Regions:
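Active-site loop/helix belt of alpha/beta enzymes
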Residues: 9-24, 29-142, 149-150
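Preference for bulky hydrophobic residues occupying beta-strand positions
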Residues: 1, 27, 172-174
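Proteins with a high burden of low-complexity, intrinsically disordered sequence enriched in S/T/G/P/A and R
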Residues: 7, 17, 185-187
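Catalytic beta/alpha-barrel core
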Residues: 1-9
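Functionally critical, mid-to-C-terminal surface segments that flank or help form catalytic/ligand
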Residues: 140-187
Length: 188
């Protein structure tokens, strides 16, 4: 599990003291993304009172780059500096800062392990990438029916599409029954 707040660390600490939880965890520190992790106040509170949490085995300390897709963005250096300070408090724990974009910025962001997200699936974390990423999967489906509909006819679950004019529509052989989320209806 990954602890993202003091409340979660307190809960894990209580469970450990009652011998109900006894595995290593990761602690996520927010160094600038303002999304997940202990914020600056919680980080300071945790580090000052670290001895209180000595029942917790911390296998990994981590953070997430907010601007990794912009290699020269000053935020990357700010986050790296903050993360290095935090990491010094956990010399026996592995550390991770680099997300997909961070992998390609510079090795100094790698620490002990990297966390490829979109890159794992062949997606580029960069808007204008010179790196030749290859998607690992493609969705292909055959058109199994073509039909003519009239203006104001509706189509699909929830009648989410309404024809603005007489038109032809095609139905492909993939959908809800195949695990394809309905939110993609009329959005392909």
């Amino acid at each position: 599990p990954i602890a993202n707040s003091i409340n979660q660390l307190n809960l894990i600490n209580k469970l450990n003291m009652k011998k109900k939880f006894n595995r290593g965890i990761a602690v996520h520190f927010d160094t600038g993304m303002s999304r997940l992790g202990l914020d600056e106040s919680e980080t300071n509170q945790f580090l000052i009172n670290k001895i209180k949490y000595n029942s917790i085995k911390i296998d990994l300390v981590m953070s997430h780059l907010a601007c990794g897709d912009q290699a020269k963005h000053s935020m990357n250096t700010k986050q790296l500096d903050k993360f290095r300070i935090i990491r010094k408090h956990f010399p026996n724990s592995k550390a991770s800062l680099a997300n997909s974009a961070g992998i390609f910025i510079n090795k100094k962001y790698h620490f002990d392990l990297v966390r490829p997200g979109i890159a794992l699936y062949g997606g580029s974390p960069f808007l204008n990438s010179k790196i030749n990423f290859h998607h690992v999967v493609n969705l292909k489906a055959k058109v199994i029916q073509i039909r003519k509909i009239k203006k104001n006819d509706t189509v699909g679950y929830g009648a989410t599409f309404k024809a603005k004019k007489n038109m032809y529509i095609g139905t492909i052989a993939v959908g809800y029954a195949d695990g394809f989320n309905r939110k993609f209806s009329n959005n392909m």
